[in-house]
Amino acid sequence: ARATRTIAETCNGIIACLWEYYVSYQPGFPEKTAFIPLPIDLRKVTSRVRCVPEKLNFFIGIQSARSNLKGTDVMLPVLQEVQRKHPDLCRITEVHDVPYARYQQLMDDADVQLDQLYSYTPSMNSLLAMAKGVTVVGGGEPENYEILNETELRPIINVLPDEQDIYKKLEEIVLHKERIPELSAQSVAYVAK
């Protein structure tokens, strides 16, 4: 904490790429804190708006050393419970500790990605998923849209760090998979902005 404060005090500017960082630094350093969203080069991403899938493909990437930080340790068992209840409507692509290039490749066939349970905003993995047209379940709080001045698009299925809320939102998208094309299109548009 002391090193962070020293760096913040002595640097010329603080670029916050997520809402969480902005609200952490802006009160103490308002004159030097600026919000600049994470950049996604859409020329390097193949975007594909998803159709209504016959069987919804959920994607969850797990880094064993960080599972409790990202919330996948909470989301995976809930997702598995939804899949057990609706085996004909959804499936799970679960990947563990794979290199990033392979992770991105495996995500290409997903309809929905689960990531960042404890975040208010999507981070790099979620933004790349959205750029591909994959719907994200994770952090999508109102503050995320407000800092971007986004008043129309709401592509992220926001979940609270609560198993009942996660279950409800996952089951809802399984039972209403006709929403996937709209959420997919909004995801691509959100990243393009």
Predicted regions and their residues:
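Short hydrophobic beta-strand element within catalytic cores of glycosyltransferases
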Residues: 135-142
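Conserved donor-binding/catalytic core segment of Leloir-type glycosyltransferases
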Residues: 36, 40, 44-70, 76
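A conserved nucleotide-sugar
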Residues: 58, 76-104
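Acidic donor-binding loop of glycosyltransferase active sites
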Residues: 108-121, 134
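A short, well-ordered alpha-helix in the C-terminal region of glycosyltransferases
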Residues: 172, 179-192
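Short alpha-helical segment that forms part of, or immediately flanks, the ligand-binding pocket
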Residues: 104, 126-131, 145-146
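Membrane-proximal helix-turn-helix segments that form the acceptor-binding/catalytic region
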Residues: 1-14
